[in-house]
Amino acid sequence: MEKRTDYCGNITEKYIGQDVNLYGWVQRVRNLGNLVFIDLRDREGLVQIVVNKDSGKDLMEIANSLGNEYVIQVRGKVVKRSEANPDMKTGQVEVDATEIIILNEAKNPPFEIKDGVEISEQTRLKYRYLDLRRPEVQKAIILRSKILRATHEFFDENGFIDIETPILGKSSPEGARDYLVPSRIYPGSFYALPQSPQLFKQLLMGAGFDKYYQLARCFRDEDLRGDRQPEFTQIDMEMSFADEQTIQDYTEGLLKKIMKDVMGIDLKTPIKRMSWTDSMNKYGCDKPDTRYGMLIHDLSSIFKDSDFKVFSGAIADGGFVKGIAVKNGAKEYSRKKIDKKADFIKRFHAKGLAWVKFEDGEFSGPVARFLTDENKEALKKEFDLEGGELVVFVADKWKVVCDSLDHLRREFAKETGIIPKGVYDFVWVVDWPLFEYDEGLGRWVAAHHPFTMPDDEGVKLLTTDPHKAHARSYDIVMNGDEMGGGSIRIHKRSIQEDMFKALGFTKKRAYEQFGYLMDAFDMGFPPHAGLAIGLDRFAMMLAGKDNIRDVLAFPKNASASEPMMHAPAPVADQQLADLGIEVEKQYEDSVKATEERLEKMAAEDAEENSTWDK
């Protein structure tokens, strides 16, 4: 095929007077009788093609035959428009066509190929190859590609080695559920797809590759949310002979390059740091949104002797009274609206939501009658009340208070419009606890993972009081979302064994699962550290999207299925037999129904669209 002169969206005034050869999709055709306008689209944008009566009968007939999404080749001369379109990059010019070649026709698509149209997720994913033609979708995918390019350039410039680690590995019951791959050669045995390359990259440090990175594909069989997919990509790095500061410096360098190359923003470094304890106490969570204020205040000292027993009773039971002040919230929030907030935080086990309003120098609301003059003055000073504020309180155990006020703070910020737009605010959260209590499992688990090095005091506490130990770990947070996390890793057998003991491992279990790692520690293993950034979530936020699916070319839906190829799907009985797998009877009807549904859909598609027998 003849070489394209340039992309449609790049045909600007510099091409005036030149003959060009373009390829693209027909976005729209406007027939004015003796004049036909064609909007030709490719990934860079639109350019207007003009065909008139002077172009000849054959060319006019071809132009009139075009439909939306036809794929065409256009030859012509670039001329200045008589009336410019300031809303288009190519709005100063148009192409006076001399030849149009139809490369492929198109049926009417199930939705318009343009931005701003309402399309169900199911339809978008079923016809993803059409959805991907839309400019806003392409823009997000291209942004992701720019992040990848900047990442490779940064690590290459800084002496890191790109090393691929295995996709087929061994299952570990820690963390989320694994995706399992049955082995035909070893019936009854399974590979697991990696949840992360954690142990492989640590072993690479033991092998002497002191600066590793990888754009690592990871897989987790977990419940999906807007910011999760069953398969995802990590920007993964590991270094030998590195401490926290070294890893953070390199991470900041990477983020600085990405923000500049992709967004045109000069990221100021060093990025501020905040302890995990401060983050929890001031923001209610370990991923603080630092773009706005509305911080959480501990009011326990003010209310420890209060006549309001909800407050004083919670404090006497070892709990806390904390609150936030919502500027201009007094008029914005009715009792009905506040009651809805109270109902919502019950999911965090909060028993209720107390509140007062401060207007014209006076407090009002359900709690106001319990406030002494001393309480009132203390609240005014604590929150720097000026008038018009709504102050909400939660009195309960520390974790309940944190979870509840974290949610309320985020909701109030969205609803009152105080979150600045176009701001990317990063913060390091450091000095984490080594363990956290999992209410669902009813036991202590590693706050990050079992290979995290405790701090010096924590090493001693591992064998005496491990749940008081702190970790040498760090998370990078942007706009209230965890972008990534890392830590100094354990590199000695004795510490790793103590860590497993603290997590309730038996010796047998520890060595069956991780004996190879502890053996490696005895072979001259260097101190090492690393970090991983969630690429998909990072791209989603930079693209201004609410769902990770918008920055993936072919994502799964909220049910972890893919409507276009119909994955997952049943497989042939012989394939199962080769693997020594038999579907349990309770699932046979479901499998049969799925097979019949897919066969019917394929038959209908063939009947309606196929040219097989024509």
Swiss-Prot record:
GO terms for biological process: aspartyl-tRNA aminoacylation. One of its GO terms (molecular function) is nucleic acid binding. It is an enzyme of class 6 (ligase). CDD domains: AspRS_core, EcAspRS_like_N. Its EC number is 6.1.1.12. Residues 198-201 are annotated as: Aspartate. Its main location: cytoplasm. ATP binds at R220, D221, E222, Q229, E482, G534, L535, D536, R537. L-aspartate binds at E174, R220, H448, R489. Belongs to the class-II aminoacyl-tRNA synthetase family. Type 1 subfamily. This is Aspartate--tRNA ligase. The lineage of its organism: Bacteria, Bacillati, Bacillota, Bacilli, Lactobacillales.
